[in-house]
Amino acid sequence: MEKVKKETALYAFVTDDGVAHRVWRIADRERVAALETLFEKVPATYIADGHHRAASAVKVGLRRREAHPDYDGTEEFNYFLSVLFPDKELKIMDYNRVVKDLYGMDPEDFMFSIEEDYQVFHLTQPISPKVKGEICMYLGGEWFLLRARAELLSARSIDPVKALDVSLLQDTILGPLLGIGDPRTDQRIEFVGGIRGLRELEKRVSQHTYAHAMDGSLEELGPAVAFAMHPTGITELLDVADHQLLMPPKSTWFEPKLRSGIFIHEIER
């Protein structure tokens, strides 16, 4: 690989978000064969991002196999495009949530309900959660630290999916208090990659709380709320996969991210 990287790149560019992309094509058959041999020695690969897209691709492939019972396994529908990274070269960032309203609750009742499962601390400035089991919340122009009660974390720790902080938030706040049953389809929730920062959460909450009236004044729509998450750990992700379970939607934000559309996998019969 180091020899190939000394050659002229097929593509070399910087995207609008400042991420540099360099692509080399390996066409030499001996090099390709050597890489295939090395990959055969890799004991396991894990889907770190795009779990639900991968599952959809598998379903499409299986349906095409049913439609073409004479398939031999070399057809393009037997494959889907992916990129592999060593786990040491991946960084998982927080994947945060913004909910556009409090589901008919006033802020005081909402805070009171949260205290059943969390210790709540007022913050003087925006910060990200430092440890697992903590969630930072932005509500009413103020930041709060939510620390899950020890007995709650202990009860959930035996299940690798329930032990995830994103599952904790969904099961204790988003679902029962804010009425977010399916975060994949509910239009009241937004997901914000941690690379955007905490100020982006404040901005979005403000956008959903206030609107410009016809006379130019600000009209209050109602309280919105944001949740800043502690990043999912690599070991947590691997543990879920090793138990043959599926990661919840929007549970990981990975860097680096390849620019979509650089490579296209065409599926033909």
Residues of each region from the PLM?
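Surface-exposed, charge/polar-rich loops and edge strands
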Residues: 1-210, 218-269
